[in-house]
Structures are given as C-alpha cells and as structure tokens.
Amino acid sequence: IEYKANQTIRVKYSKTGNVVAMDINDYLRGVVPSEMPPSYNIEALKAQAIVARTYTYKKMMTHGEGEEADMCDNHTHCQAFYDKDTLFSIWRKRGFSEELIKEYWNKINEAVVSTQNQVITYNGEYIKAFFHASSPYKTENIDQIWGGEKLPYLVSVENEEKEDYQ
C-alpha cells in the first residue's frame, strides 16, 4: 500500500459488526486519544499519531481484496478506536468540561494534521509499530516481549525515566 494522505479506510465496529468507511485522518483522530490520554504533551500525541498511521498502513497491507474491513476498533486485534461522538461522551461522563473537551480535540487534531505525511519505514517497508506508554529505565527487545522474530529497529535501549514522561 502506498501512503496517501486522504486515504479512505473501512473500520469494523466490534460491538455491532458495522463497517464504516472514513478518511484515515478521522480514524487516527479516534485512535490517538484511545491509545494515549489526550492530556499528554503534544509531542507525545504527535509520536502516537505517526506510530498509529504506520501501524494502520502495515496492517492494511496484510488484508486481501475480499476483506470486509481494513481495521477494527478492538485493541487486541488492531488499535483502540472510538469515533468523535463516543470520545466526547466518554469525556463528559468523566466530568470533563466542554472547554477541556474542545482543548483535547484541538490537540489531537493538531497531532494528526501536523504529522500528516509522516510514517516510519525500515529498508523501504512500514515497520511493525509496536508501542507502549512508559518503560522504566530500559526498553526490551521485541522478541523478548512478543516472541517471534528479532527486529533490528526494535531493540533494547537505556531510558532515563523522568516523572514528566507525558
């Protein structure tokens, strides 16, 4: 799959089985705050947008022509995803003010739009973009966490843990 900024993707909702076509940026606006708290620093949200975009394109490459959907909303199979209306509803139930909801949505939009043409590749291929929010002092090699093949771009590194990791 060649990266296209205005790509339309098909997302399957696990609870209903419905498949909805949407712009990839709308999808990413739903993934970023579903995978990472919108209170995090804008640079962390941008990194999440790039990783989510890369993961999406890599995943789409494995789907055949006859597949019903490109992605789903199940975080154990694809990536966590909530559409805008659902996110706003969740945030309201958590007691977020309308002002804070607007601030978070603007931040998420900025993260997605400002990284629009950015994906991560290794030797011309989209990487397997596994991610996590925090790693105290050191990351691990991917094969030690998920098993399977070693990936030269996902190796253990020292990490100076900071309290403001967001």
Name what the model sees in each region.
Residues 1-166:
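Conserved, single-site charged/polar hotspot
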